[in-house]
């Protein structure tokens, strides 16, 4: 937005998506040719035929990704029969919550309801307003929600994945075949 890409002679349009599956659809439709996505949604999309390759890494670290719930829910076991907010079906959140629930023998397909939040993702008010009973929340919204008594942390993803390949940069096969110079300049 400050002209960096234009100064490099690159005509770039930035498009936001709400999770890896949505981005994979944009790749498959040809409207996106370079992007960043979580590794689990990429692996799924690639197995389903997405014509893209990993060209870089954006983050490898512990995940500062916390599962927060209403203050009256004190553990993962308390989520049985509840609504849990995730970014989107097939997103990293979906992958993470399924792992967390499985360790407590809670069936993510029957014992809870997973609610895609899309553009509302990360808003602590969703828990306070009881739109969902729990959701993944990151800073600074997490500290604000705890301070205001809207939520409590009941688990963290880093306990399950101490070092995690959080984000990958991918490019469409078409651009890898035809626009390597441009990809190099973008990177």
PLM region descriptions:
Residues 1-119, 123-129, 133-139, 150-157, ...:
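Short, glycine-/small- and polar/acidic-enriched structural segments
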Residues 2-6, 166-187:
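Extended ligand-binding regions for polar small-molecule ligands
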Residues 145:
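Short helix- or helix-capping micro-motifs
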């Amino acid at each position: 937005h400050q002209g960096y890409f234009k100064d490099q002679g690159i005509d770039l349009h930035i498009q936001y998506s709400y999770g890896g599956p949505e981005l994979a659809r944009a790749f498959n439709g040809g409207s996106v040719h370079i992007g960043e996505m979580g590794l689990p949604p990429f692996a799924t999309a690639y197995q389903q035929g997405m014509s893209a390759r990993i060209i870089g890494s954006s983050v490898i670290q512990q995940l500062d990704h916390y599962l927060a719930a209403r203050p009256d829910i004190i553990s993962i076991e308390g989520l049985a029969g509840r609504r849990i907010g995730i970014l989107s079906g097939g997103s990293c959140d979906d992958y993470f919550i399924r792992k967390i629930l499985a360790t407590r023998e809670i069936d993510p397909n029957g014992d809870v309801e997973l609610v895609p939040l899309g553009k509302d993702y990360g808003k602590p008010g969703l828990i306070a307003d009881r739109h969902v009973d729990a959701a993944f929340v990151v800073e600074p919204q997490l500290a604000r929600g705890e301070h205001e008594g809207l939520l409590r942390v009941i688990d963290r993803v880093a306990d399950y994945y101490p070092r995690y390949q959080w984000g990958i940069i991918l490019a469409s096969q078409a651009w890898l075949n035809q626009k390597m110079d441009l990809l190099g300049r973008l990177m």
